[in-house]
Amino acid sequence: MSPVTGEETPAEQQGTADNPVYVRRIMGLETEYGITNVLDGTRRLGPDEVSRLLFSPIVEKYRSSNIFTENASRLYLDVGAHPEIATAECDSLHQLLAYDRAGDELVQQLASRAEEELASNGIGGNVFLLKNNTDSMGNSYGCHENYLISRNVLLKHLSSQLLPFLVTRQLICGAGKLTIPSPGAPNENFEAGFMMSQRADYMWEGISSATTRSRPIINTRDEPHADSSKYRRLHVIVGDSNMSETTTALKIGSALLVLEMIEAGAELPNYELANEIRAIRDIARDFTGLTEVKLRSGETATPLEIQRTFHAAAVHWLEHRPEPECVDGRWLGTPREQLAPVVELWGRVLDCFETGDFSPVDTEIDWVIKKKLLHGMASRHGLEMTDPRLAQIDLRYHDIHPARGLFNVLKRRGQAASILGEEQIREAMDQAPATTRAALRGRFLTAAREHGCATTVDWMRLKINGEFGSEVALPNPFAATDPQVDEMIASMADLGDTDATARG
């Protein structure tokens, strides 16, 4: 089997024909950032103005605010003046972590240039990019997870098994949030205080095709960016944006294991919830994990019980799960060595709910790190949880600036754990993932910009514009090589007489 060449699609390593075990999966993250310009505590430019300034070098160079970067990720300005990065196609957990972090670094570089431009124009101030999910006006923006899954799995079956996991997953990977109730808001019937999840109050349905007006936990819009007869794209929009690499690894890694089990037909318990939206909001405010939620069966269960059951199944699954291939030192899929720490941390977090002592994970889980930070400041200064100074600390935790952001300060002090080295992140900023279709897109874009060729690029297509141009479709996201793309790149030296563009 040679899935990297595109001769075969991903790996049915074991299992039956009806229930193959997929240990190689295309996945990606879409992250929207909050943005603001502040000088001496006062806002200077509005979000629209500062976002336009942020993207001005991109527009000047490529004549578009919607481009693919040389690491094959997509950078664009989303609705509501939110800068957004969609990572390139990844096929292993640590690879995705690296490209998620690379996205932070790329948009922060734009913010630093914007600050220089503001200073030269006499406006001044800092440009803050916040990797969070809510603003002071009550708006929410997301961190969307994308997983390529088998078309053979019925959507109804998938949602009934996956929704209980996603609703209760905030226990192990929420980003944490200070919340103050306001009339007409989803939190109006709750007390002010700290909650585990930033997104819980902004979900309105379990599953639907909407994304904003009636925001669901799982979005069903069917855009697989692959062979639609074989695959669908699972689009999860309930997750929080995480600053912690260990929390992100737990969020993605646990989901990978649950999806593998569902696809393989593993026996999982029936925890189908009677009301996912009521459950997700109640769970977000209970740090015991013992809030009883109603099931469709008429019984009740606690989020801790539900997560314990999924965790136990994942432990058993990992013991018998086949290893993916490793070709030329690169994993084609997520190996046990990356998933074993995920399952171990998952269990430790749940143990903390049992004991009520979260100190064993207070450098690894975002909501625990933030809660400790906020409660420490409140205790030292005698502050109520509604104090505006604590709200500022909450926001500054999500500032991605390497020197100024509070999470990064904690990491330098050894109070927040990490997984990746700086070299891995730098490499991900400059190069596309080597094991997926993204490698072709990255090579194509690099060559086009070197030779000054005008191009049009999207997830499944590469095109050289002009009278003598050519186009190649890339339907297989697992194929990292393609002779037609090689020919296109070789032809660029003769065609490069126009300005390069890379429109998404």
Swiss-Prot record:
What keywords would UniProt list here? Answer: ATP-binding, Ligase, Magnesium, Metal-binding, Nucleotide-binding, Ubl conjugation pathway
Chain sites annotated for binding Mg(2+) = 30, 76, 84
Q: In which pathway does it act?
A: Protein degradation; proteasomal Pup-dependent pathway; Protein modification; protein pupylation
Under Pfam families, the record lists: Pup_ligase
Tell me which InterPro entries the record gives.
Pup_ligase, Pup_ligase/deamidase
- Source domain of life is Bacteria
Q: Which GO terms describe its molecular function?
A: ATP binding; ligase activity, forming carbon-nitrogen bonds; magnesium ion binding; ubiquitin-like protein transferase activity
UniProt-listed Enzyme Commission number(s):
6.3.1.19
Presence of keyword Metal-binding: yes
Class in the EC hierarchy, top level: ligase
Q: Where does the record place the catalytic residues?
A: 78 (proton acceptor)
Q: Where does ATP bind?
A: 74, 87, 459
Name the catalysed reactions: ATP + [prokaryotic ubiquitin-like protein]-L-glutamate + [protein]-L-lysine = ADP + phosphate + N(6)-([prokaryotic ubiquitin-like protein]-gamma-L-glutamyl)-[protein]-L-lysine
Q: Name one GO biological process term.
A: protein pupylation
Q: Which PANTHER family match?
A: PUP DEAMIDASE/DEPUPYLASE (PTHR42307), PUP--PROTEIN LIGASE (PTHR42307:SF3)
Other notes:
The reaction mechanism probably proceeds via the activation of Pup by phosphorylation of its C-terminal glutamate, which is then subject to nucleophilic attack by the substrate lysine, resulting in an isopeptide bond and the release of phosphate as a good leaving group.
Role, per record: Catalyzes the covalent attachment of the prokaryotic ubiquitin-like protein modifier Pup to the proteasomal substrate proteins, thereby targeting them for proteasomal degradation. This tagging system is termed pupylation. The ligation reaction involves the side-chain carboxylate of the C-terminal glutamate of Pup and the side-chain amino group of a substrate lysine.
In the record, the note on similarity to other proteins reads: Belongs to the Pup ligase/Pup deamidase family. Pup-conjugating enzyme subfamily.
Q: What is this protein called?
A: Pup--protein ligase
State the organism of origin: Corynebacterium urealyticum (strain ATCC 43042 / DSM 7109)
Q: Which gene encodes it?
A: pafA
